[in-house]
């Protein structure tokens, strides 16, 4: 366990006086640590330090095992709800044949139907670097073919030797 996530409980708590709260919300007020430990032992629960920076530190009497289980459960739920965005990249060139464009656009539409984002990338070779507008024109041509099933997230942008365009699945 890392230092930041480490929770002090029972005898590990060093403060002499603590503000103690019960698991059911009962406020015991400011009492000595030993007295708080005695109460927690009587109830068969743990004394957990929840606010170490407060004056005096705040402790709660609770079942630590159950508390940790619930925290882990919350983290798993949060992780499940997170959605990872997968970006598929399709590479093109300025001198690509029409049937190859059709093939790559077909693949892109399959990716979009699966809910993936697609990045079209035109690589500029040699003299093509002097006219990057040809790469932009190529991406505009691709956009005309795919605009019915996608939203354009990024307009065609010239980035070094590449011209990039990002499309996302249509919402709704």
Swiss-Prot record:
GO terms for molecular function: ribosome binding; translation initiation factor activity. It is found in: Cytoplasm. Disulfide bonds: none annotated. Keywords: Cytoplasm, Initiation factor, Protein biosynthesis. It comes from the Bacteria. SUPFAM superfamilies: Translation initiation factor IF3, C-terminal domain, Translation initiation factor IF3, N-terminal domain. GO terms for cellular component: cytosol; membrane. Transmembrane segments: none annotated. PROSITE patterns: IF3. One of its GO terms (biological process) is ribosome disassembly. Its main location: cytoplasm. IF-3 binds to the 30S ribosomal subunit and shifts the equilibrium between 70S ribosomes and their 50S and 30S subunits in favor of the free subunits, thus enhancing the availability of 30S subunits on which protein synthesis initiation begins. NCBIfam families: infC. Monomer. Belongs to the IF-3 family. This is Translation initiation factor IF-3. It comes from Campylobacter concisus (strain 13826). The lineage of its organism: Bacteria, Pseudomonadati, Campylobacterota, Epsilonproteobacteria, Campylobacterales. The gene is infC.
């Amino acid at each position: 366990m890392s230092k930041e996530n480490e929770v002090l409980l029972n005898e590990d708590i060093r403060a002499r006086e603590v503000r103690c709260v019960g698991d059911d919300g009962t406020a015991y007020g400011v009492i000595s640590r030993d007295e708080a430990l005695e109460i927690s032992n009587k109830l068969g629960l743990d004394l957990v330090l929840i606010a170490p920076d407060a004056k005096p530190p705040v402790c709660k009497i609770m079942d630590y095992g159950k508390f940790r289980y619930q925290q882990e459960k919350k983290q798993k739920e949060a992780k499940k709800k997170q959605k990872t965005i997968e970006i598929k990249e399709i590479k093109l060139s300025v001198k690509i044949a029409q049937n190859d464009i059709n093939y790559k656009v077909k693949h892109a539409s399959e990716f979009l139907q699966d809910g993936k984002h697609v990045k079209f990338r035109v690589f500029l070779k040699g003299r093509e670097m002097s006219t990057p507008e040809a790469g932009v024109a190529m991406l505009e041509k691709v956009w005309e073919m795919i605009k019915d099933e996608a939203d354009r997230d990024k307009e065609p942008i010239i980035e070094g030797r590449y011209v990039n365009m990002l499309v996302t699945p249509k919402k709704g």
